[in-house]
Design a protein with these regions (language model features):
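Histidine/acidic-residue-rich, glycine-tolerant segments that coordinate divalent metal ions
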Residues: 1-88
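Glycine-rich tight-turn/loop motif centered on a GG-T
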Residues: 8-16, 48-59, 94-96, 134-153
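Short glycine/serine/threonine/alanine-rich loop segments
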Residues: 72-75, 94, 116-118
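Conserved beta-strand positions in the central sheet of alpha/beta enzyme cores
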Residues: 38, 96-98, 121
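Structural recognition of alpha->loop->beta junctions
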Residues: 87-107
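Active-site-adjacent C-terminal substructures of enzyme catalytic domains
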Residues: 4, 102-154
């Protein structure tokens, strides 16, 4: 699938807009046999219109996907870098959170209070490779602009 936000990248991602579309796609994925649905709740440093500290899904969209997944006994995981995206994950029972690197004090408190059922994967492997061995994917200017090395230091 060619995504509009990353025109030079083929992806298996599905794009949705609005709670009803998230519900529909979640049901479709479950009918196709998936066990885990991954949501991309925050942006990322390489997405031009939505940086890592941006929350790109609304609460209603996350709630809609979570409602369907939980009703069918499926799990959710999430790309969640921004503080608000981490909070949305906890509020809606998303058990696996990737990154969480911009979590504020409130988000950290929520993670601590719910640590018995949450799994946080900082996913620093990609960041380390991009920062120091990513010549095939990124220019030095992109590495600096995306803050990969700073991310490893924080």
């Amino acid at each position: 699938m060619r995504t509009l936000h990353m025109p030079k990248v083929d992806s298996m991602a599905l794009m949705a807009d609005g709670p009803e579309e998230y519900r529909r796609l979640a049901r479709e994925l479950i009918r196709e046999g998936v066990d885990i649905i991954k949501l991309v709740i925050s942006g990322d440093s390489f997405v031009p219109h939505a940086g890592s500290e941006t929350t790109i899904m609304s609460e209603a969209e996350v709630a809609a996907a979570a409602e369907v997944a939980h009703a069918h006994g499926k799990r959710l995981s999430a790309h969640a870098r921004s503080a608000e995206s981490v909070k949305l994950c906890v509020r809606h029972g998303i058990k696996v959170i990737y990154h969480a690197n911009y979590a504020d004090e409130e988000a950290l408190d929520l993670l601590e209070a719910n640590k018995d059922w949450l799994f946080i994967s900082p996913n620093i492997g990609f960041t380390a490779i991009a920062a120091y061995e990513g010549d095939d994917w990124f220019t030095e200017e992109q590495v600096q602009a995306m803050g990969f090395r700073e991310g490893l230091d924080s």
